[in-house]
């Protein structure tokens, strides 16, 4: 990301925001490493959505507004894509990794008058991997809305005062989506049928709000760069719910 930012023709505000967001994903991969080390079941869907959205997040940085992408950026993107593919293949195709990812989170357990810190098996019925994937993918809606909203503040700094209400609405919608997804997925993991339908409604509403704002405030370039990752996450959510 730093190489691409350095070689970019224009180090503008939007590129800086997108570069920072892409670099924050390094923390996401550290979190993924922690989940794998502890054998957590959630590592598979988390690794899948993290890898897919990372490729999109960095890919939109490589392509300039005009001309051909610089060679260092292309090489870095190729290496990053290969690494993300390797992560997904290991999580979903490796029998050794699959046999390791069977643990649940630890917590305080009171049994026989003794308090201990150990693995807590959820009381709810076993959750399928696709439901977990839908949950993790849906949780990306909020940041994928807030990042372009932050990019759009650059137009306000450039004197486009008329965009203030739309940008504020964009931020509010991004925050509201996070709470809606949190509420919905809590019941989704309990396999409530209405929660599936509600998540579909949330997904379609998110797209209906975010994509027009991307086009209006960021143009066709912003629609592709910032809309495509959200569309990908939405399609993955809908596909996971269908499975």
Mark where each language-model region is.
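Topology signature of small-to-medium multi-pass alpha-helical membrane proteins
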Residues: 1-243
């Amino acid at each position: 990301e730093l190489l691409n930012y350095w070689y970019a023709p224009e180090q503008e505000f939007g590129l800086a925001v997108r570069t920072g967001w892409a670099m924050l994903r390094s923390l996401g991969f550290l979190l993924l490493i922690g989940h794998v080390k502890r054998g957590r079941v959630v590592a598979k869907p988390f690794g899948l959505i993290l890898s897919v959205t990372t490729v999109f997040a960095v890919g939109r940085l490589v392509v300039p507004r005009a001309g051909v992408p610089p060679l260092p950026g292309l090489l870095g993107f190729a290496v990053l894509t290969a690494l993300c593919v390797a992560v997904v293949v290991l999580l979903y195709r490796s029998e050794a990794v699959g046999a390791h990812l069977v643990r649940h989170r630890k917590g305080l357990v009171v049994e026989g008058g003794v308090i201990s810190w150990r693995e807590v098996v959820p009381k709810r019925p076993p959750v399928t991997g696709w439901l977990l994937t839908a949950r993790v993918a849906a949780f990306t809606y909020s940041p994928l809305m807030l990042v372009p909203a932050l990019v759009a503040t650059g137009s306000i700094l450039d004197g486009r005062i008329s965009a203030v209400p739309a940008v504020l609405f964009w931020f509010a919608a991004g925050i509201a989506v996070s709470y809606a997804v949190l509420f919905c997925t809590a019941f989704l993991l309990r396999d409530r049928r209405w929660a599936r339908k509600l998540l579909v409604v949330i997904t379609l509403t998110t797209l209906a709000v975010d994509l027009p704002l991307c086009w209006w405030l960021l143009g066709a370039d912003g629609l592709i760069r910032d809309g495509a990752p959200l569309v990908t996450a939405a399609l993955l959510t809908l596909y996971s719910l269908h499975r």
